[in-house]
C-alpha cells in the first residue's frame, strides 16, 4: 500500500534539518565525527516512521544511529519524532541498502538493523530481498569484524528462506526464534511490531554475526521455501 503524500514535506524536513545528512558519501569513513566517543555505529535499513529508531536511541544514548530510508514521506515523520524527543545521536539518510559501500568505509558499521522489510514474495523478486546473498555481500564490505545483523520479520516464508541464505555468505546465526514475544514483549518494537503483537501474530527474529568467509566461484541460487 502506497503511503499518502505528506503535506509540506520539504519545509517539514527543513525544520528537522539538523538530523538530516544531505551528502552521506562525503562522510564515508568519518561518520563517527558526528558523535565523537560513540560506543558503536549502527545503521537501520528502512526506518519507516521511526518508532524503533527513536526508542533505540533513547535506550542507548551512547550509540551513533544512522537511519536509512528511501521513502521521504515516512522519513519526515521519523525525523520529527527524533527532533521532538531531543535525541542528538540519530541522523537520517535518504537512500537504500545498495549504496551502503559508497556511504560507509570497510569495517565502519558495528550493527545493521533490518526490521520488517518488504518480503518480495515472488521467486523472480528474490534478489530484491534485503537478506539475499547480493545484499549480504554488501553488508560484509561495511561491517566491522564480528559485526552483526539484527533481523526481524512477520513473514514466516521470508524468515525460513533467510535462515538458509544468510549462513551461505559468512554469517553465523544465533538467537533464532519464530515467536519472539511468546512470553510478552521483548526489546524495542517498531510500529508494525506493536500492531502484529496486538493481533497475536508471531514475530521472527535472529542475529547474524559476520565470520571469516571466502566467496565461492558461483554461489548456489536456491529456490524459495514452500
Predicted regions and their residues:
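Conserved beta-strand signature within the Rossmann-like core of class I S-adenosyl-L-methionine
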Residues: 146-153
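Conserved glycine-rich SAM-binding loop
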Residues: 48
Amino acid at each position: 500500500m502506497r503511503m499518502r503524500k505528506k503535506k509540506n514535506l520539504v519545509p517539514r524536513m527543513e525544520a528537522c534539518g539538523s538530523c538530516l545528512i544531505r551528502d552521506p558519501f562525503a562522510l564515508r569513513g568519518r561518520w563517527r565525527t558526528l558523535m565523537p566517543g560513540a560506543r558503536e555505529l549502527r545503521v537501520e535499513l528502512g526506518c519507516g516512521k521511526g518508532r524503533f529508531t527513536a526508542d533505540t536511541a533513547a535506550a542507548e544514548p551512547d550509540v551513533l544511529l544512522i537511519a536509512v530510508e528511501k521513502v521521504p514521506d515516512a522519513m519526515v515523520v521519523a525525523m520529527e519524532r527524533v527532533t521532538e524527543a531531543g535525541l542528538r545521536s540519530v541522523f537520517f539518510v535518504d537512500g537504500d541498502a545498495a549504496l551502503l559501500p559508497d556511504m560507509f568505509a570497510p569495517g565502519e558499521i558495528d550493527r545493521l538493523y533490518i526490521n520488517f522489510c518488504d518480503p518480495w514474495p515472488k521467486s523472480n523478486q528474490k534478489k530484491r530481498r534485503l537478506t539475499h546473498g547480493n545484499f549480504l555481500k554488501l553488508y560484509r564490505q561495511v561491517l566491522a569484524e564480528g559485526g552483526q545483523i539484527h533481523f526481524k520479520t512477520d513473514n514466516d516464508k521470508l524468515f525460513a528462506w533467510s535462515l538458509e541464505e544468510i549462513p551461505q555468505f559468512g554469517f553465523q546465526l544465533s538467537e533464532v526464534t519464530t515467536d519472539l514475544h511468546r512470553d510478552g514483549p521483548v526489546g524495542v518494537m517498531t510500529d508494525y511490531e506493536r500492531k502484529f503483537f496486538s493481533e497475536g501474530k508471531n514475530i521472527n527474529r535472529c542475529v547474524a554475526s559476520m565470520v571469516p568467509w571466502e566467496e565461492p566461484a558461483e554461489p548456489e541460487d536456491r529456490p524459495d521455501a514452500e
